[in-house]
Amino acid sequence: MEENNELINNPAVEYTDDNIRHLSDMEHVRTRPGMYIGKLGDGSHAEDGIYVLLKEIIDNSIDEFKMQAGKKIEIIIEENLRVSVRDYGRGIPQGKLIEAVSVLNTGGKYDSKAFKKSVGLNGVGVKAVNALSSRFEVRSYRDGKVRIATFAKGDLLTDTTQNTTEENGTYIFFEPDNLLFENYSFRPEFVETMLRNYTYLNTGLAIIYNGQRILSRNGLVDLLNDNMTAVGLYPIIHLKGEDIEIAFTHTGQYGEEYYSFVNGQHTTQGGTHQSAFKEHIARTIKEYFNKNMDYADIRNGLVAAIAVNVEEPLFESQTKIKLGSTNMAPGGPTVNKFVGDFVKTEVDNYLHKHTDVADVMLQKIQESEKERKAIAGVTKLARERAKKANLHNRKLRDCRFHLNDAKGDKKEESCIFITEGDSASGSITKSRDVNTQAVFSLRGKPLNSYGLTKKIVYENEEFNLLQAALNIEDGMEGLRYNKVIVATDADVDGMHIRLLLITFFLQFFPDLIKKGHVYILQTPLFRVRNRKKGVYETVYCYSEEERIAAIERLSPNPEITRFKGLGEISPDEFKHFIGKDMRLEQVSLRKTDLVKELLEFYMGKNTMERQ
């Protein structure tokens, strides 16, 4: 039930029985979608709501596979808009089919005997998909009968039962409601990443996505091999136990990288299982070598994956991206103890049996320690300098809300524009949203950091101040902005500055790019306008093709302006380019890219090959 907001805003309004509203389950989901799927979005980001809808449907099919009912899931996404999912499990019990997809808190997964370690939250998930779809259809195939029900925005339209020769299982079709997910589109790369993660966690499961077969034979080893952007220093260590699987290696890159899962769910923000692994992997390695090692040196360059199965898992949000459970099961061991005991026993045994791997690991840790100590003096001075500069730093014009705030609904909107020079930063500063948009101004071209050690991050004032502004010296957990946006001119010099900044991030903070935080701001190349009936009609063009189309539309004799740099765009105009319709291009790495080779080719010495 809800109280009318008018009562709160205007106490003089009479408060009667008529002010009390009861919402049906489907109405409640549509009225408060964020409670069920997080943010809505349009599909341009991997966390957007349409991917949560897809995941909720697939989760139920995955649970069938886990119950050894069906080894194949077929998924078709038509025109990146309409989704159908067919599994070959047992099929939803037909007598309760309507309730199972339309009545909240109805489902078989409350019976832990049937689904002891379930990923699909049957009480809510599929119902939310139904409510938030303009069209929804479910078919349950069981023992020669198929029951078919169709819905629109959660309302039942048709319900029929007929004979069938098809195999048992469930078919679901849905089309997200464009009124809620405005101009949405499923991005194949986000969908494929999601589906591959399902196969890594469920070896032997075949997912057929738009005709493409996705399969994993080696679980988390395949995950690391497919996602690592640097060569492992030793073969991936892969260890499995009851309800736990881990895989890890070290690379020559800076930082740490983790992939964590609970009951097949990718916990992108980690949680108690990932924290336990980080703590105990470092402690176990330190105890094995029996040396006075710093945990940061042990974990530097570590790339790891951990998957656990938890009974009745508790997540910190409905989207299930961070595990909050303290216990593996009601009355069972804590997550920390369970993970710690496994890591301590299995990793220690492995290192004793594979001393050649242990030798490589020790060498890597000692190299990290040597570099850390070499820059210790510099980092202390740099931190003091950055602290003083941050108090009156003209380079950083900060915003009010940040990604690492404890609370707040604007955290995800926080961003920082990295610009070149005062003219460009001045225009952005005057037109920005001070609540969520910060500006960092570079002084000319930054240093080419390729091949340099992390010492340069502290010795170079601009790099040190940028690192301090982002708050990433000690890892991504403290990152202050969800989007780090490079805003440079669209000329050769601007492109060079982009490359230099991306090199800096890839060299020292690769997770910033791997986790999808870095973007390029697309600004218009042309302004085409024409005065009609005393009013200017203006079109901003981002390409030559758009310019030609605008000239045709605004003919005859339109006025054409070419923007040579960001500084030429007035603050009044700039606000159009950094508002809700801001065009951003995400900086991403292909799975086949190796960072070292990539940087060597583009930013290394001018060899014959590069020429």
Model-derived segments and their meaning:
Residues M1-N19, I50-K55, D63-K66, G70-Y88, ...:
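GHKL-family ATPase ATP-binding module
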Residues R32-L54:
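Conserved short strand/loop->alpha-helix "switch" segment adjacent to the catalytic nucleotide/phosphoryl-transfer site
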Residues L40-D48, T268-Q269, P330, N448-E459:
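Flexible beta-alpha connector loops of hexameric P-loop NTPases
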Residues K370-L391, A406-K410, S414-C415, G426, ...:
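C-terminal interaction appendages of subunits in large macromolecular complexes
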Residues K113-A114, V146-F151, A206-N210, P510-R529:
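Interdomain boundary/hinge elements
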Residues D25-M26:
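Alpha-helix capping/hinge segments and adjacent helical runs
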Residues G91-Q94:
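A short glycine-centered beta->alpha linker in the GHKL/HATPase_c
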Residues T31, M35-G38, D59, D63, ...:
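Conserved helix-loop functional segments at active or binding sites
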